Amino acid sequence: MNVTFDLTPPSPSQREALIATLNAEERRILLQHGTEAPFCNRLLDNNQLGTYTCRLCGLPLFHSNAKFKSGTGWPSFFEPYTHTHIRKQHDTSHGMIRTEILCARCNSHLGHLFPDGPPPTYERYCLNSVSLTFIPTGTLLPDQLHRGDNTTYRT
């Protein structure tokens, strides 16, 4: 199913309201490009069918059918919901060279992309659980920005 989502960034007032819903750990990771500890995050062992959306703006980012056990301690996916929903950025922090992945709509930090995933893409999108909200199959996707693009689509 081809569904189009509005990728226009939240207005400053919308962004402020969304940020106000975050706890300190979510702010550290989503806004300050932090990383949660491995093997102790809430979505690592989630095996339910559904869609993983951006914790801040609700944009669909990954589907459960692309999730796999990477053994790294973070939820991992071999492809995004759609490539237009993910923004990639060169990251040289902490003495490493990596590809950071961000939400294409709100620019929240999600995690990193590595070239060591399974077929068919051989990519591993390594995500922070706190960057994501899991929406079970059959549930309406959230519409945090009140744009109406998520309200008619069930996961």
Swiss-Prot record:
One of the Pfam families matching this protein, by short name: SelR
GO biological process assignments: protein repair; response to oxidative stress
Superkingdom: Bacteria
Gene3D superfamilies in UniProt: Peptide methionine sulfoxide reductase
InterPro entries, per database record: Met_Sox_Rdtase_MsrB, Met_Sox_Rdtase_MsrB_dom, Mss4-like_sf
Keywords: Metal-binding, Oxidoreductase, Zinc
Sequence positions that bind Zn(2+): 54, 57, 103, 106
Domain MsrB: 15-137
EC number: 1.8.4.12
Catalytic activity, reaction form: L-methionyl-[protein] + [thioredoxin]-disulfide + H2O = L-methionyl-(R)-S-oxide-[protein] + [thioredoxin]-dithiol
Enzyme class at the top of the EC tree: oxidoreductase
Cofactor note: Binds 1 zinc ion per subunit. The zinc ion is important for the structural integrity of the protein.
Known cofactor(s): Zn(2+)
CC terms in the record's Gene Ontology section: cytoplasm
A molecular function GO annotation: zinc ion binding
NCBIfam families documented for this protein: peptide-methionine (R)-S-oxide reductase MsrB (TIGR00357)
Similarity field: Belongs to the MsrB Met sulfoxide reductase family.
Protein name, per record: Peptide methionine sulfoxide reductase MsrB
Organism for this UniProt entry: Xylella fastidiosa (strain Temecula1 / ATCC 700964)
